[in-house]
Design a protein with these regions (language model features):
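Canonical positions in the second alpha-helix
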Residues: 30-31, 64-65, 99-100, 133-134, ...
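Residue-level recognition of tetratricopeptide repeat
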Residues: 2-4, 13, 38, 47, 72, 81-82, 107, 116, ...
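Register position in tetratricopeptide repeats
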Residues: 17, 51, 85-86, 120, ...
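Structural marker of alpha-solenoid helical repeat scaffolds
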Residues: 1, 34, 68, 103, ...
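TPR alpha-solenoid repeat register
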Residues: 7, 41, 75, 110, ...
Length: 190
């Protein structure tokens, strides 16, 4: 059964690589007909729904996972972060993210999500506290981007300058991140 699940997840991964999100949804839906409680498959379908901007269906699948496993920190984080970026339901997002944080306090993605909800709520000092903690654990491009945005908003230009200089060297092959970092450089006149 584990081998079959791994094969299914590999198939889903391949479809995602080629942006075949509708195929992912169909594939997952077929698998879920046999077993509607496959958390990994529900999660994969939820992310595919998000990619085609079907946020209500994404939310439905993520909430189903939470009805099966209410302590699933990754799902709490995914749902909370999605509510931050796709809706204005910041208080609800914060509640979900704080639960995720309680279950997995060292998770850089969760720290980043909390920083982003704080940023969107206008709590820039709190956002900075969480994003610094996230950045110190993981140099994921999205975390770097959020860190720079929050540093800029907090007028921490010296730190921003150092981070940009360091990350431009580290991420020279990531064109999107390079462009974003250069735009912060220009905006802050660094």
């Amino acid at each position: 059964k584990n081998i079959q699940l791994n094969l299914n997840l590999k198939q889903i991964s391949l479809l995602n690589e080629y942006d075949k999100f509708y195929d992912v949804i169909e594939y997952c839906t077929n698998l879920l007909e046999d077993d509607p409680y496959l958390i990994n498959i529900l999660y994969a379908r939820a992310m595919a729904y998000e990619n085609i901007e079907k946020i209500d269906l994404m939310e439905q699948d993520l909430r189903k996972i939470l009805s099966i496993d209410r302590r699933n920190a990754n799902t709490l984080n995914a749902l909370g972060y999605s509510l931050v970026i796709h809706t204005k339901r910041y208080d609800e997002a914060y509640s979900l993210l704080y639960k995720a944080y309680q279950f997995d306090p060292g998770n850089a993605a969760i720290l980043d999500s909390i920083a982003w909800v704080e940023y969107n709520k206008g709590n820039y000092d709190e956002a900075l506290r969480f994003i610094e903690s996230s950045y110190n654990r993981d140099k994921d491009p999205e975390i770097i981007e959020h860190y720079c945005e929050i540093l800029f908003k907090n007028k921490k230009y010296d730190t921003l300058k150092k981070v940009i200089k360091l990350e431009l060297k580290r991420n020279e092959n990531n064109v999107d991140l390079m462009n974003k970092l250069r735009s912060y450089q220009n905006d802050a006149k660094l």
